[in-house]
From Swiss-Prot:
Site keyed Activation of NADP-MDH: positions: C76, C81
PROSITE patterns according to UniProt: MDH
Leading EC class: oxidoreductase
Function: The chloroplastic, NADP-dependent form is essential for the photosynthesis C4 cycle, which allows plants to circumvent the problem of photorespiration. In C4 plants, NADP-MDH activity acts to convert oxaloacetate to malate in chloroplasts of mesophyll cells for transport to the bundle sheath cells.
Residues holding NAD(+): Q206
Transit peptide: 1-58
Keywords: Chloroplast, Disulfide bond, NADP, Oxidoreductase, Plastid, Transit peptide
UniProt-recorded name of the protein: Malate dehydrogenase [NADP], chloroplastic
Family: Belongs to the LDH/MDH superfamily. MDH type 2 family.
Catalytic activity: (S)-malate + NADP(+) = oxaloacetate + NADPH + H(+)
Organism phylogeny: Eukaryota, Viridiplantae, Streptophyta, Embryophyta, Tracheophyta
Organism: Pisum sativum
Keyword NADP included in the entry's annotation: yes
Molecular functions (GO terms): L-malate dehydrogenase (NADP+) activity
Annotated S-S bridges: C76-C81, C417-C429
Length: 441
């Protein structure tokens, strides 16, 4: 609802300083600031003001400011402190109830594309107000302030609140969606096992924070690599949230596979359906051409080149990220953000009849014979309620079973590497090979 009418009876915010930009820091046990809160006003600064006014249906008034307890939790950034209270509005049909979306790695390139898609309404719809809770690090906090400033300047009507912090317990408070993008990239000389441990510790901490303060039905999408095992670590540290609610992002791999099949068949990519990425987000991933369809027909009836499908197609999908890095000089960011949007929309929009989508999900109870207690990409369908079910009507041949066994073995080995982070004892790391995607190097 746009602000269309001003009412002079609403009181003005109390002003405490003349500075244009200020920071409020809070600490727990560390000396460095853990939470930044800055306020912009057209002429003066409002340090501790919370804005609210009573809004009747079909009536909008200018907000009245109320002094906020300085000891209370700062819950807004900049101009978002000056927005009117949505509580009364939520009772009307103009807005849905505000949802809290937490994003880690919020100062990174992927988030730089994603946040503006979220704020614009592209993801959750044009009538869904959102609050963005952005998690950064001590090193990235200034960049995160810049991101918040850009969000301010974009004037998104659906973006009602922005919080920036380096404390996951603050960012994940009441989160209904958690998009976990931040992870340490693999540097020169870093062994794959070491990276599993380094990033695993990050996701163990974030899992504990989600467990403590997030919504009990929060949906969690893990993007930071190695995302399958990071998702497993996260869910093991968040027993209060259903394991089924955790996803490892394999949608970019699915999109890449659809693109390659469309190119080979000479059709537009919307003709490709029923595409599954099985297994790990690594070069052992299995793009499934056996069950995929092109214009409603089995792929093998359209592309009658089994050698190309088994060799060139599969390798192109597995190594697409590395080729992009060679051409572009950096890893995927824009296309990754698009795939995150696709992954979310697949959960909140009913899956088209007969189709499905790929997501890395917890394997317990799966109908395919995949080992339990790992996060494995499989075909899913959704009714659009944020939940999903696994697809039963898929077929397997010897080639597909052989490939599935390889990626399954890799994930089981990764699981043993992080046993100390999942509460399953001492880690024993014996990885079958270095199959990490080039973008993670």
């Amino acid at each position: 609802m746009a602000l269309t009418q001003l009412n002079s009876t609403c009181s003005k915010p109390q002003l405490h300083s003349s500075s244009q930009l200020s920071f409020l820091s809070r600490t727990r046990t560390r000396t460095l600031p853990r939470h930044y809160h800055s306020t912009f006003a057209p002429l003066h600064r409002t340090q501790h003001a919370r804005i609210s006014c009573s809004v009747a249906p079909n009536q909008v008034q200018v907000p009245a400011a109320q002094t906020q307890d300085p000891k209370g939790k700062p819950d807004c950034y900049g101009v978002f402190c000056l927005t009117y209270d949505l509580k009364a509005e939520e009772e009307t049909k103009s807005w849905k109830k505000l949802i809290n979306i937490a994003v880690s790695g919020a100062a990174g390139m992927i988030s730089n594309h994603l946040l503006f898609k979220l704020a614009s309404g592209e993801v959750f719809g044009p009538d869904q107000p959102i609050a963005l809770k952005l998690l950064g690090s001590e090193r990235s906090i200034q960049a995160l302030e810049g991101v918040a400033m850009e969000l301010e300047d974009s004037l998104f009507p659906l973006l009602r609140e922005v919080v920036i912090s380096i404390d996951p317990y603050e960012v994940f408070q009441d989160a209904e969606w958690a998009l976990l993008i931040g992870a340490k990239p693999r540097g020169p000389g870093v062994e794959r096992a070491a990276l599993l441990d380094i990033n695993g510790q990050i996701f163990a901490e974030q899992g504990k924070a989600l467990n403590a303060v997030a919504s009990r039905n929060a949906k969690v999408i893990v993007v930071g690599n190695p995302c399958n095992t990071n998702a497993l670590i996260c869910l093991k540290n968040a027993p209060n949230i259903p394991a089924k609610n955790f996803h490892a992002l394999t949608r970019l791999d699915e999109n890449r596979a659809k693109c390659q099949l469309a190119l080979k068949a000479g059709v537009f990519y919307d003709k490709v359906s029923n595409m599954t990425i099985w297994g790990n987000h690594s070069t052992t991933q299995v793009p499934d051409f056996l069950n995929a369809r092109i214009d409603g027909l089995p792929v093998k009836e359209v592309i009658k080149d089994n050698k190309w499908l088994e060799e060139e197609f599969t390798e192109k999908v597995q190594k697409r990220g590395g080729v992009l890095i060679q051409k572009w000089g950096r890893s995927s960011a824009a296309s990754t953000s698009v795939s995150i949007v696709d992954a979310i929309r697949s959960l909140i929009t009913p899956t088209p009849e007969g189709d499905w989508f790929s997501s890395g999900v917890y394997t317990n109870g799966n109908p395919y014979g995949i080992a339990e207690d790992i996060v494995f990409s499989m075909p899913c369908r959704s009714k659009g309620d944020g939940d999903y079910e696994l697809v039963n009507d898929v077929i397997f041949d010897d080639y597909l079973r052989q490939k599935l066994a390889k990626t399954e073995a890799e994930l089981l080995a990764e699981k043993k590497c992080v046993a100390h982070l999942t509460g399953e004892g001492i880690a024993v790391c014996d990885l079958p090979g270095d199959t990490m995607l080039p973008g993670e190097m």
